[in-house]
């Protein structure tokens, strides 16, 4: 009897444990039950425990032990060793790897610094399943033996970019160089890629505009639709999309043309048949047996001559595995007419097209040339036409433009050159790297530091002003692309000196006083020592916080390492730095409603995320900055203390005090008034950013720790530790050594 029942029970168990059942029973996040709940998950990305190498792992030190030439030699071997499970077009994976590197780096966008090659995010969802990244899962699998061989010494982010470089070099193109230093992420980044979740849906709003911070015009694309906007083969409209998308990825017209023309010199597009009819699920939705691969092709052999990627089909040149000028010459040599690929995608072919392109798998077969709608756009658009014709007439200029644009594409999200590692780093510096001058003087020592702190405090500047200035300077840092920060003292330069959040008039007076201290220290010295303004700004903030702690009864000393230098206005691209302007800074209770799409609270989480803060770090930082009275514009919102300027835990104590009743302020949206429950007397004012630390249960849990009677000293030390962290976020000169 048991033998008869057992198969039935097994069958029932299998039926019960279907993916649908698993999905129904899986744990849910708060937002599933409470859609309006605050999402703090971005701040949990900064918990080091997710890194399997551990908290003491230093990637820069590992990379410095790497034999880069040996890695490049191994990559060259992979390039021309075709694998049966995914054969190489023309016997060379070079073009395939260029696409992999390009698409890894090409997600970068200027407005929030997210995307890019750093972190190796192409390995994770959703990027690994974007239609524009179709089949790049195979490219990374081809590289696995190399990654396996060198392990911790080279990250996926570095390996993918290096492979793209080696591919270009092996096919006859001279690159500008390569810099390592991209540390791998260990989970998907949390990024807003667009309002919808349907692949290839239009990212534009109802007015036809692409909202910030987006750069790609359609969901799941790196840049633009190669068939034309939303699949319509209109070269003029495509040019408009190209210009906007590439500009939002930090590229001007010349760099854009160089990248497209240079990249499309190599390889081919794959559209042997319809993707909808032939391809299986993307990696993120494929079965376990696929082991992270996706787009299984059920048509024909499934690869080689039957490969399907974009649905477009063909090559731009007759020699797809060598660098030539054919892309540009073919663009102008032929009259291009609209046609469709075997998969039904819009593309272009020469009028009276001849079969001149060798087949990728059968050397006895030939095909016509082809172009995308986005290629024809470079000939139709007046400005792009000027550049393409100039490049066609000046091949050496084109080569250099492509080399520079490729280097920028693959390194733009790495931040300053101080993060660059390896022997192939170009000696030339570029304005987009936010260059810093080298220090040509001796650094100050501990005695000098004590002397300077004393002199700063004797300038007559209040602790509040010194702390505000240090925060304004250092908090521009964003860990998304490692830009900003105090190093360079660009807060004294355009555009930062005029940002409303920085209270420009007050800032000017503080900087003037600090520069006087700097000049007095530096002049007529015989020991070769100097101090930079950027060091003084941080030192002034540290001295002021130590003084504020002393006033509250605590003796602290904030560690300080000199070495920052001061950039010039000529080393500062005003338009490039403009995107770093905080239109919301919850740490200073500042919010410009006209220039924000996120709420004040969501903006705080976003800024804390860019500052690489955890939930406790953000919480203690808010509490400390509030009692130190550093709000922008002198606002008293959230200054929940009767002793402003003293570093203590009063913000949390008073926020959680049940003797206060909070009501919405009639004076301004997003602000609240706190009244004494017994007397009805107004005690405090606060913003939504302040009250969320008592309203949200997770934030309140942390706030309760710091409001406790036994946490007064803990609060002071935790605050100063986080302060030190923020002041040093841009000190890559220290981190890499």
Curated annotation (Swiss-Prot):
Its main location: periplasm. CDD domains: catalase_peroxidase_1, catalase_peroxidase_2. There is a cross-link at residues 102-223 (Tryptophyl-tyrosyl-methioninium (Trp-Tyr) (with M-249)). Keywords: Heme, Hydrogen peroxide, Iron, Metal-binding, Oxidoreductase, Periplasm, Peroxidase, Signal. Binds 1 heme b (iron(II)-protoporphyrin IX) group per dimer. GO terms for molecular function: catalase activity; heme binding; metal ion binding. Heme b binds at residue 264. Residues 1-23 form the signal peptide. Transmembrane segments: none annotated. It holds the Pfam family peroxidase. The active site is at 103 (proton acceptor). GO terms for biological process: cellular response to hydrogen peroxide; hydrogen peroxide catabolic process. It catalyses: H2O2 + AH2 = A + 2 H2O; 2 H2O2 = O2 + 2 H2O. The record marks 99 as: Transition state stabilizer. It comes from the Bacteria. Formation of the three residue Trp-Tyr-Met cross-link is important for the catalase, but not the peroxidase activity of the enzyme. It is found in: Periplasm. There is a cross-link at residues 223-249 (Tryptophyl-tyrosyl-methioninium (Tyr-Met) (with W-102)). InterPro entries: Catalase_peroxidase (IPR000763), Haem_peroxidase (IPR002016), Haem_peroxidase_sf (IPR010255), Peroxidases_AS (IPR019794), Peroxidases_heam-ligand_BS (IPR019793). Belongs to the peroxidase family. Peroxidase/catalase subfamily. Homotetramer. Bifunctional enzyme with both catalase and broad-spectrum peroxidase activity. This is Catalase-peroxidase.
């Amino acid at each position: 009897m048991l033998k008869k029942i057992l198969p039935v029970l097994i069958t029932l168990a299998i039926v019960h444990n279907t993916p649908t059942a698993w999905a129904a029973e899986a744990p849910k996040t708060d937002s599933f039950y409470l859609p309006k709940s605050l999402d703090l998950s971005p701040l949990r990305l900064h918990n080091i425990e997710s890194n399997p190498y551990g908290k003491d792992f230093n990637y820069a030190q590992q990379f410095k032990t790497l034999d880069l030439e040996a890695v490049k030699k191994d990559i060259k071997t992979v390039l021309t060793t075709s694998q049966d499970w995914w054969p190489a077009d023309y016997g060379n994976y070079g073009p395939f790897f260029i696409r992999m590197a390009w698409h890894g780096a090409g997600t970068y966008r200027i407005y929030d610094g997210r995307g890019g090659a750093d972190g190796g995010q192409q390995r994770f969802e959703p990027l690994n399943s974007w239609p524009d990244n179709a089949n790049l899962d195979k490219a990374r699998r081809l590289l696995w033996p190399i990654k396996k061989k060198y392990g911790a010494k080279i990250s996926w982010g570095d390996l993918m970019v290096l492979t793209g470089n080696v591919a270009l070099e092996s096919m006859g193109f001279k690159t500008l160089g390569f810099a390592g230093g991209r540390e791998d992420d260990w989970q998907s980044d949390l990024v807003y890629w667009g309002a919808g979740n349907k692949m290839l849906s239009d990212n534009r709003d109802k007015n036809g505009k692409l909202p910030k911070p987006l750069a790609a015009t359609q969901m799941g694309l790196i840049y633009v639709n190669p068939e034309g906007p939303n699949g319509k083969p209109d070269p003029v409209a495509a040019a408009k999309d190209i210009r906007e998308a590439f500009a939002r990825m930090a590229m001007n017209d010349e760099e854009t043309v160089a990248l497209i023309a240079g990249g499309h010199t190599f390889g081919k597009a794959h559209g042997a048949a319809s993707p909808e009819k032939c391809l299986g699920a993307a990696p993120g939705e494929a079965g376990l047996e696929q082991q992270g691969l996706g787009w299984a092709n059920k048509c024909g052999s499934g690869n080689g001559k039957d490969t399907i990627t974009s649905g477009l089909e063909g090559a731009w040149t007759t020699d797809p595995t060598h660098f030539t000028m054919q892309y540009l010459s073919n663009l102008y040599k032929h009259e291009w007419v609209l046609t469709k690929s075997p998969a039904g995608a819009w593309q272009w072919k020469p009028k009276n097209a001849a079969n001149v392109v060798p087949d990728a798998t059968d050397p006895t077969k030939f095909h016509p040339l082809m172009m995308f709608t986005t290629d024809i756009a470079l000939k139709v658009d007046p400005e792009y036409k000027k550049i393409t014709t100039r490049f066609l007439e000046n091949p050496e200029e084109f080569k250099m433009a492509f080399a520079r644009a490729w280097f920028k594409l693959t390194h733009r999200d790495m931040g300053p050159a101080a993060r660059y590692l390896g022997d192939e780093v170009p000696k030339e510096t570029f304005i987009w790297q936010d260059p810093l001058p080298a220090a040509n003087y001796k650094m100050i020592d501990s005695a000098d530091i004590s002397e300077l702190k004393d002199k700063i405090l004797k300038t007559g500047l209040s602790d509040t002003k010194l702390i505000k200035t240090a925060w304004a300077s250092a908090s521009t840092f964003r860990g998304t692309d490692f830009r900003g920060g105090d190093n360079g003292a660009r807060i004294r330069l355009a555009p930062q000196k005029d940002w409303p959040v920085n209270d420009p008039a007050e800032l000017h007076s503080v900087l003037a006083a600090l520069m006087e201290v700097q000049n007095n220290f530096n002049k007529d010295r015989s020991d070769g020592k100097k101090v930079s303004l950027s060091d003084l700004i941080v030192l002034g903030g540290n001295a002021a916080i130590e003084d504020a702690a002393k006033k509250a009864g605590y003796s602290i000393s904030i560690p300080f390492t000199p070495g920052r230098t001061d950039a010039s206005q000529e080393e500062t691209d005003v338009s490039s730095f403009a995107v770093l302007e905080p239109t919301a800074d919850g740490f200073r209770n500042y919010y410009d409603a006209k220039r924000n799409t996120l709420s004040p609270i969501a903006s705080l989480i976003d800024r804390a995320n860019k500052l690489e803060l955890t939930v406790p770090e953000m919480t203690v930082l808010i509490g400390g900055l509030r009692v130190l009275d550093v709000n922008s514009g002198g606002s008293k919102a959230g200054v929940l203390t009767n002793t402003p300027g003293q570093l203590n835990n009063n913000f949390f104590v008073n926020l959680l005090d049940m003797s206060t009743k909070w009501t919405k302020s009639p004076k301004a949206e997003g602000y609240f008034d706190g009244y004494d429950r017994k007397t009805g007397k107004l005690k405090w004012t606060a913003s939504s950013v302040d009250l969320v630390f008592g309203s949200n249960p997770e934030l309140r849990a942390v706030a309760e720790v710091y409001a406790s009677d036994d946490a007064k000293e803990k609060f002071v030390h935790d605050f100063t530790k986080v302060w030190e962290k923020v002041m040093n976020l841009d000190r890559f000169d220290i981190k890499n050594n």
